[in-house]
């Protein structure tokens, strides 16, 4: 048993039972974005959260324990993602990454945007030309220190 197997079981059960991430998030009491990341193996659940997720997805006690282990975050199976939607994000960073970096540095100074003190919100934005995906990323600015 390992974390990847637990993630695969969660995805399989989600499909067969028609479970929505929003429903899981409501039961856990956190955002759909964070809970989805946790269920996909990218975040760590506490014991209570793992028990709730375990009940929804029919996980054993051992499988629930795996949800409480700190994962290897950002561990995609290939260097360049092949899934079209994930690849678009890769492409966005390749095209706009230097622009984002320049504008953040111009506004805040030399530093980084945290992915630890971080939140995101994904919503559908109706548009007569075709609905749009509205993604808001919010990370704390962390300046580099001098020493």
From Swiss-Prot:
Domain of life: Bacteria
Catalyzed reactions per annotation: cyanate + hydrogencarbonate + 3 H(+) = NH4(+) + 2 CO2
InterPro entries: Cyanase, Cyanate_lyase_C, Cyanate_lyase_C_sf, CYNS_N, Lambda_DNA-bd_dom_sf
Catalytic activity, EC: 4.2.1.104
Keyword Lyase tagged: yes
Active-site residue numbers: 88, 91, 114
Keyword annotations: Lyase
Record GO biological process: cyanate metabolic process
Family matches, as SMART domains: Cyanate_lyase
Entries under Pfam families matching the protein: Cyanate_lyase, CYNS_N
GO molecular function: cyanate hydratase activity; DNA binding
Function: Catalyzes the reaction of cyanate with bicarbonate to produce ammonia and carbon dioxide.
NCBIfam families: cynS (TIGR00673), PRK02866.1 (NF002773)
Protein name per its UniProtKB record: Cyanate hydratase
